[in-house]
Amino acid sequence: VTPLARACGAEVVGTFLLVLFGTGSVAAAVMTGAQVGLWQVAVVWGFGVTVAIYVTAAVSGAHLNPAVTLAFAILRPKSFPRARILPYWGSQVVGAILAGAVVLAVFAPFIDRFEEERGIVRGEAGSEASAMIFGEYFPNPAIFGTGPEAEALVGPLMATAVEALGTAVLVFVIFALIEPRNGARPMWMTPFFIGFTVAILISLFAPITQAGWNPARDFGPRVVAFLAGWGDIAIPGPRGGFLAYIIGPLVGGTLGGLLYDLTIRSALPVEDPLPSEVSRGG
């Protein structure tokens, strides 16, 4: 088995864990009320990211996110060859699809009850309220509902910009935490701080876009929802909304990494102040 195959396998496993914990927490909150408040969901997401990174970082670098992979390929090509972009992306999407399928299998009766109680017809307008446990929608249907009044609050351009902003912050932090010349980097605590950053970003921006920051996390479960009867509500989504969760993170992640290089990395000492460690993405 080649090193690339092992790395891709780790990306499948890591992305599966991340998406399972994250979308599972959303499903539990929306369908059963198990989590009370956005911060509880955000914390589960954050710990899911942390666990997934600890499990896979030594094998693949734990990108677990196409936006992180693209940023590394463009800005750190010596450590991450660009030929690995598509294999990593494919692995991440596969892991996310598998996680979405597990969430559907586990929560299927609760989804049916949720839709029946609220008169939701799966695949029709308004079924974003149940589809949101898989893909993401703007604004957050659990907070603002669905329909024209809700849609007037957040347009596709704003949603794309918010997704770009959140992913830019995330990759900026990741680059800072793993930079060998950063004498203050937390070493083995790096995955925790990446997960904590994700939790903070979710708590801030989830009311607006559900806070994706990860094209695989959004698209993989969307595929499951599409096949499970949500159809156009899943892909392309109302107002073609799924594109916001692909374009925004891919652009924002690279811009965030570039901003780190221009503002902080360029000011760091030339010598590596600490022993090198495995690069960890998020």
Protein language model regions, located:
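Membrane-interface helix-loop junctions and terminal tails of multi-pass membrane proteins
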Residues: 1-282
